[in-house]
């Protein structure tokens, strides 16, 4: 990218005496318009050319005029961005560990909480986390804009530690439910904040993979939990150790976050321009100072448009109004909420939460150990998604894997139909292995597609409504999680396992059809271009975006 003919923004420089000043560029880096004393509290960056003016100057300028500036981001990217994403992704480890550890704990609790648990009490203990996460996900959107992404992550870690200690020390069902509720509140915060934080830091060409780091940690946490479930299965009250271990990664992340930056867009909203300049310079170590300054000013211009003057309550109600009245924002909200609905009503968390109980029901004697297969499948195929989501694209992966999910669930329903009524008397029917195989098929396709694509939701929304829109979408995730976790065992008893898994297959079919007509290909696009694409309507956006996909790779339109 040649920046010589593009009007540039301001950069920090020094005169012959070493005194810092700000240089406002005109058309070439060698030409200066004025010098003003440098202040650590830089408040303003001069106005920039609009996109038409930039394109008239340089045919490639549209790459820089976007919010994410793909031309600028073609520069070498520092490994630091991977470290930041990994530190934030530890929240996913907490999420996944809690999902997996409850499966093993429910199978070995026995009467340790005062009596043998009923199905309803197991559902209550499991769903308490989802209910709390729903509450926190609903409220954390506007909190993220008020206090920042990083501070909320710090709070979530402290909350998770407290909840883990309470669960480990539980003496009755009520105490366990309270601990699960507290942990759920922390998980709900991170399920919204982490994908948004990574999205706002990530270069466009790496955004999909960087966000999937969060999902990799989720599935990694589940695998660790299933392994520990097996290790402590025969340890007296080993479930207490299993719950207590969950506090360790939370403490590790809490300490690590003190060395990570706040989101650049949040910082610019609060006029911390110099901090953003330093962050982008570190992410793009080979970029020219003028390129960094231009990028900073582009983001700042977007923040100024997205957040007009006013107090916090005015901003909130303004964002709420814009989210529901602007057609492109409504489409973004529909896609975000729909994808989260699809993920939860596919039935995956029923399998994650109750895998040990499921495998017990079909006749596996060592059901907790068999559950490790569930965690391993989820983890391995999330890595597959990590490798290909920015190469093949979100839409193509989603459509293909959804069809395989339907086949896996249908096969599971059929296998349950032919299982003997009393699996304790006949454990060699062969159909139990068909159930296991079908669940592996389902989870492999789930982890490759709908298991991670909804967490890309922050890319759907412009800055003005990002936290709010992502908050609504995440809330739908936890509503679905709550419904499934609170009703799965009851469904298995009332409409039979065959009916339950057939119902999940039906939900997936609805998800596949809706995805085909409404979900465009977004890989490789800047956030600003995504917003422009969705202005054209669902089907037009789908048609235009699919033209960008050529021979298995993503080309920017």
Curated annotation (Swiss-Prot):
Q: Where in the cell is it found?
A: Membrane
Membrane topology type: Multi-pass membrane protein
- What is the superkingdom listed in this entry's lineage? Eukaryota
Q: For this UniProt entry, which segments traverse the membrane?
A: 77-97, 100-120, 124-144, 158-178, 181-201, 210-230, 241-261, 368-388, 397-417, 433-453, 469-489, 499-519
Biased composition annotated in UniProt, kind: Basic and acidic residues: 30-44
Q: What is its main location?
A: membrane
Please tell me whether the keyword Transmembrane is annotated for this protein: yes
The record ties this protein, via PROSITE patterns, to: MFS, SUGAR_TRANSPORT_1
Extracellular face of the membrane? 98-99, 145-157, 202-209, 262-367, 418-432, 490-498
Alphabetically sorted, this entry's keywords are: Membrane, Transmembrane, Transmembrane helix, Transport
Q: Name one GO cellular component term.
A: plasma membrane
Chain residue ranges for the region called Disordered: 24-69
Q: Name one GO molecular function term.
A: myo-inositol:proton symporter activity
Q: Which InterPro entries does its entry note?
A: MFS_dom, MFS_sugar_transport-like, MFS_trans_sf, Myo-inositol_Transporter, Sugar/inositol_transpt, Sugar_transporter_CS
Cytoplasmic side of membrane: 1-76, 121-123, 179-180, 231-240, 389-396, 454-468, 520-557
Which biological processes are named by the entry's GO terms? myo-inositol import across plasma membrane
Q: What is the stated purpose of this protein?
A: Transporter for myo-inositol.
| Family to which the UniProt record says this protein belongs | Belongs to the major facilitator superfamily. Sugar transporter (TC 2.A.1.1) family.
Q: Quote the protein name from its UniProt record.
A: Myo-inositol transporter 2
- Gene that encodes the chain: itr2
